[in-house]
Design a protein with these regions (language model features):
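A short beta-loop-alpha structural element at the N-terminal edge
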Residues: 2-18, 70
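A short helix-loop-beta-strand connector motif used in the catalytic cores of GNAT acetyltransferases and
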Residues: 43-55, 71-76, 125
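Conserved acyl-donor/pantetheine-binding loop and adjacent beta-alpha core of acyl/acetyltransferases
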Residues: 72-124, 189-195
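Conserved GNAT acetyl-CoA-binding A-motif
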Residues: 123-124, 152-165
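Conserved beta-strand-loop-alpha-helix junction that forms the acyl-donor binding cleft
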Residues: 127-129, 133-136, 161-171, 187-190
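Conserved acetyl-CoA-binding loop-helix of GNAT-fold acetyltransferases
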Residues: 137-150, 175
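Conserved active-site alpha-helix within GNAT-family acetyltransferase domains
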Residues: 142, 154, 166-183
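Conserved catalytic-core motifs of GNAT/GCN5-like acyltransferases
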Residues: 161, 179-196
Length: 209
């Protein structure tokens, strides 16, 4: 198994879109077309919010990504903002897309509530972390996480945070030494089914020499 870590390239987008669609189970509550658009909105949004990227490539195939953001240094290129705008607009053009987007509007609101309740200012954020389900348990997630930690240390950032929830493997973050700070429960109505989810903020404190 040969794994290479490198910076994000635009040519990685489609493969990463597929990983995100699979990781966040978009097909469980949306048609395939809308699931693809949701993944595109999510990925383009994350790509407006980073200063460091590492993509994992195994045997020539993209299998994971991590994005970290040094908030003080962050500047988003206009092209990334425009890509996000186009993705959101495309989602909102259909009735199904508009209905599904309400769920994600709720999630954004919950994340903001978590930040407000946590009442801490962090110099950095882990903006995106995803690994293909085919490659989990092979140490790729740990490699990506360690690369982000090295970046934080080089930048002399003493802490960072991330948002996660019960749809993700949030136990991974605890194994990497992150601490859960706050949590919030929310019930969604998806396709007539009640879905109970918990949302968290995790933090990591670094010793910066």
């Amino acid at each position: 198994m040969q794994v290479q870590l490198r910076e994000y390239h635009k040519s990685d987008f489609n493969e990463l879109e597929g990983i995100i669609r699979q990781t966040w189970h978009y097909d469980e509550f949306a048609s395939p077309k809308i699931a693809t658009k949701l993944a595109r909105v999510f990925l383009t949004s994350c790509l407006t919010n980073y200063t460091f990227s590492r993509v994992a490539v195994m045997n020539g195939k993209v299998v994971g990504i991590i994005l970290a953001n040094n908030i003080a240094k962050h500047k988003c290129p206009f092209s990334n903002r425009f890509a996000q705008f186009k993705a959101i607009l495309s989602l909102l053009l259909s009735k199904e897309g508009r209905n599904v987007s309400k769920i994600f509007g709720n999630v954004h609101g919950i994340d903001q509530q978590l930040l407000d309740e946590n009442n801490k200012k962090y110099p950095a954020e882990l903006a995106l972390f995803a690994v293909s389900s085919e490659c989990r348990g092979k140490g790729i997630g740990k490699m990506l996480f360690q690369s982000a930690l090295e970046y934080m240390k080089q930048e002399k950032l003493d802490s960072f945070y991330l948002f996660t929830d019960t749809s993700c493997n949030y136990g991974f973050y605890e194994h990497q030494g992150m601490e859960r700070c706050v949590e919030k429960e929310h019930i969604f109505n998806i396709k007539g089914q009640r879905a109970n989810m918990k949302f968290f903020i995790y933090e990591y404190l670094l010793s910066v020499a």
